[in-house]
Amino acid sequence: MKSYLQNFKRFRPLLEELVARDVKIKYRRSVLGVLWTLLNPLFMMIILSVVFSNLFKFDVENYSLYILSGQVVFNFFSGATTDAMSAIFGNASLIKKVYVPKYLFVVSRVFSSFINLLASFTALLLVMIATRAELHWTVLLVPIPMILLVVFSLGVGLVLSAVTVKFRDIMHLYTVFTTALMYLTPVIYPMSILPGWLYKVVMLNPLTPMLMMFRNVMINNTLIDIPTLLVTVVETIAMFLIGLYVFYKNQDDFILNL
């Protein structure tokens, strides 16, 4: 862990370059560029709001904000972990030529997704202002669920990037997994409609309490539940440490599979 931190400080300028490169590549040859980070969640919010507000009569105040806040959280996790999955073999040519701490490639993918998260968060704020939703002081607590989400995603990304170097089929399986995971995360539906057994299943999803905390401070104007926060912190730290361990144990074999 000590060497990881030392390398992180030493190679910080390189990390910044990698993040900038990842963002540029993502929006290369796009007329609107990074603006799509604002527009995508807004378009999806409109579509989902129209569809689900007519199909299902959910008793949710300002359903558009409810959906958009769910998208902000889930899309970051899905995008960050998916991008992190290809971080190692996607940089094979560089890894083979020079020594670079390999975890930096994973961190850069997650950090570039974090920039998208900030843009999506801006879109959420704009919608709140446009709909005259109340902005309470609890919005100042938003960094708490955001930091937990980023660290948790980094832990998952480290595991996925290490495993995918050897087993590329993971990429296809993970697409199916994230689709299923979205329906096990209260992105488009309120928790109140779930029967008892399904409620417990959805609460086992680590993203659920993070999303609930995010919504509480952003649109519900309520404080974060301390017991929920403590459990989420433990889960996040555990996932991050697991990610570091798996990555560290496998990184010396990466070159053999690139």
Please annotate each region the language model reported.
Residues 1-258:
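Hydrophobic transmembrane alpha-helices and immediately adjacent juxtamembrane helices
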